[in-house]
Structures are given as C-alpha cells and as structure tokens.
Amino acid sequence: MHFHFSKMHGLGNDFMVVDCITQNVFFSPELIRRLADRHTGVGFDQLLVVEAPYDPESDFHYRIFNADGSEVEQCGNGARCFARFVRMKGLTNKYTIHVSTKKGKMVLNVEEEDLITVNMGVPEFEPNKIPFRAKQSEKTYILRVGEHTLFCGAVSMGNPHVVTVVDDIRTAAVETLGPLLESHERFPERVNAGFMQVVSRDEINLRVYERGAGETQACGSGACAAVAVGILQGLLDEQVRVHLPGGELEIHWQGPGKPLYMTGPATHIYDGQISC
C-alpha cells in the first residue's frame, strides 16, 4: 500500500494527515502504531483522516486515531490542521468548513491560512454523557486517585475530560497522576486529564495527559475543557488565554448552553509519501 500524507502540528501537538477521498487507504490499529513510532515510523500524536461527507450538511468527515491505534471522538488542535489541510490540498476553497465527527458536528472558520477558529460545540456536563460515573452533575467532584484525593471538574468536549486545579503547573504530578486519571474506574471510556494553574481571570497555564497518547505539547479540546470547568466553577471570565507547553490558544465561552470557540494556529511541516 502506497499513499501520500502531510505532517502538521498545532502548537507542537503533531499529526499525520491523510486524504482518504482521493486515496484508498485502510488504517488498522497495528499499522497506526507502526506509523506513529518516532524511531521507525513517521511519528505523531494522532492520525487525522479526511473522508467524504457522511451527510449532505457536511463538507467532510473527520476521523482521529491516537498513536496507540484507538479511534477517538475529538481533537481540537487536529481540527485546525484539518481545516488548513483541506484548503491547502484543494479539496475545498471555503473559509467556513462543516465537518462531521464520530460524536457530532463541528464548524471550522479560516481566519487566515494558518489561524483557525473552531466552534467546538456546547460543553456537556451531564455525567452520563461524558461519560462519568456520578449520581448527579456537580461543579466539583472528589476523586480518589492512588494515595491522593483530588477535587476535579468533568466535562465532554465531544471527548471526555477531567480537570484539576493546581498551584504550579511546573511541579504538578502530571507524569504520575495523568495515567491514573486516564484509566480511573469512574470514566468507563477513559479520560483526558488536564492540570490547570489559574494565573488570572483571563489567563491559565495548562498541561494535559491525553487518553491514548500521554502528555502532549498542546491539547485543543483539553484547553476548551479547562476553560469551561474554570468558568463553571467561577474562576474565569468568558475570554481566556491558555498557555500550553507548545504555545497559546484563545478560548471564548459565554456559559452553559452556549457553544465554545477556540482560536489558534495550524502549521504545515512537510508532505511525504510512504509504502507499507
């Protein structure tokens, strides 16, 4: 099997992006794991697949696979790269692009060729829709994680997130708590774990341990989840700058029931082709 691809990143969260409209490529979990290997493959956090639309209201269907081969519902940084890719490859000339995903629909707005605003949809706090095992929706939950007791927020941005407020992002125990939270029994589909330091009401520092990928340089849906939880808990205002290890995102949310918007860069690194 031989196919063309692009390597892209959103704030260091890196992707292999493949057009499966003009190419016929099948990605098995084993093949994805081989391609994701940074020593013997292409190397990436996620594989993004562009498919023909599943319904007449969408321009494309957007699929996301983690480096471990698992398919996931959402990737905000990937969505920005997806928008740049389909324009760069001549698959569309639209500036507003409608895509379907495993979990729903998204709208991608191209502000400039490398600056994209994504309508991430309405944050979902109902436990059974995250999914998260809890009797009722709360702003803050208490989780036992190993020897630790954590006060967390839980939300779905199309994929499940748990967010913990920390005093200093530099000393947060992301390496140890991240994998424990990811596989916590109260999250039946596993979860992305965010560690948020509130700098001010319009600024946070954030690290994210991603489900199936580990800690990444940036996580767009994680940034959205952190801001949504912070606003719900009364810690943040509606316009927030998020500092991640790989760079900055701007998040805007007017509160429960309203869609959340994320603005950030999408960077093309190179084009390649591979036989496997």
Curated annotation (Swiss-Prot):
Positions marked as site (Could be important to modulate the pK values of the two catalytic cysteine residues): H161, E210
Pfam families in UniProt: DAP_epimerase (PF01678)
Assigned EC number: 5.1.1.7
Positions bearing the site annotation: Important for dimerization: Y270
MF term (GO), any: diaminopimelate epimerase activity
Pathway entry: Amino-acid biosynthesis; L-lysine biosynthesis via DAP pathway; DL-2,6-diaminopimelate from LL-2,6-diaminopimelate: step 1/1
The keyword Amino-acid biosynthesis is annotated on this UniProt entry: yes
Active site: C75 (proton donor), C219 (proton acceptor)
Gene Ontology CC terms, in alphabetical order: cytosol
Alphabetized InterPro entries for the sequence: DAP_epimerase_AS, DAP_epimerase_DapF
Enzyme class: isomerase
Keywords: Amino-acid biosynthesis, Cytoplasm, Isomerase, Lysine biosynthesis
GO biological process: lysine biosynthetic process via diaminopimelate
Subcellular locations according to the entry: Cytoplasm
Residues annotated to bind substrate: N13, Q46, N66, G76, N77, N159, N192, E210, R211, G220, S221
Family under the similarity heading: Belongs to the diaminopimelate epimerase family.
Subunit note: Homodimer.
Function comment: Catalyzes the stereoinversion of LL-2,6-diaminopimelate (L,L-DAP) to meso-diaminopimelate (meso-DAP), a precursor of L-lysine and an essential component of the bacterial peptidoglycan.
Protein name: Diaminopimelate epimerase
Source organism per UniProt: Vibrio cholerae serotype O1 (strain ATCC 39315 / El Tor Inaba N16961)
